[in-house]
Structures are given as C-alpha cells and as structure tokens.
Amino acid sequence: MKTLLLTLVMVTIMCLDLGYTLTCYKGYHDTVVCKPHETICYEYFIPATHGNAILARGCGTSCPGGIRPVCCRTDLSNK
C-alpha cells in the first residue's frame, strides 16, 4: 500500500506544472513552452521578396512590430 501511495505521489509531482508557463505556436505546427518572463504569444509576417511574406510565431515579452502583428496572453492563441 505504501508503494502504491509513493508511486501516485511521484506521478503527481512529475505531471504537475509547479509554475504556470505559457505555450505558444512556433512556426506553422510546432509549439514551444515559453520562459517564465515571456508572457505574450505573437504572430506577424516578415516581408520577403516577390510580394511573399514569412510567418513568425513564438513567445515574447512585448508585442513585436511587423506586418499585421497579433499578440495574446493565453495558451496556443497565436494561430
């Protein structure tokens, strides 16, 4: 019984997020867990050649510039 209880406690500790961390999209499908001081998910376009644009997504401390920036403070909200 003690072994089962110890196992449950260990699993709980390993699965618990002891400090809230933000998760954002990085690129088109990948996600990234932000550092504790990064509180914003962002998405914007970087101008490229021939009228194309490159999508930039990730975590940040402030809303970046760029074309049509979108910034938010909730998990996976920069899609």
UniProtKB/Swiss-Prot annotation:
Keywords of the record: Acetylcholine receptor inhibiting toxin, Disulfide bond, Ion channel impairing toxin, Neurotoxin, Postsynaptic neurotoxin, Secreted, Signal, Toxin
Tissue expression remark: Expressed by the venom gland.
Signal peptide segment: 1-21
GO MF annotation terms: acetylcholine receptor inhibitor activity; ion channel regulator activity; toxin activity
Annotated SUPFAM superfamilies: Snake toxin-like
Entry annotated with the keyword Secreted: yes
Disulphide-bridged cysteine pairs: 24-41, 34-59, 63-71
Location of this chain's protein in the cell: Secreted
GO CC entries: extracellular region
Gene3D superfamilies documented for this protein: CD59 (2.10.60.10)
Lineage: superkingdom: Eukaryota
Keyword Membrane annotated: no
Principal place of residence: secreted
Cited function: Binds with high affinity to muscle nicotinic acetylcholine receptor (nAChR) and hinders acetylcholine binding to the receptor, thereby impairing neuromuscular transmission. Causes muscle paralysis, spasms and increased respiration.
Similarity comment: Belongs to the three-finger toxin family. Short-chain subfamily. Type III alpha-neurotoxin sub-subfamily.
Descriptive protein name: Short neurotoxin 4
Species of provenance: Pseudonaja textilis
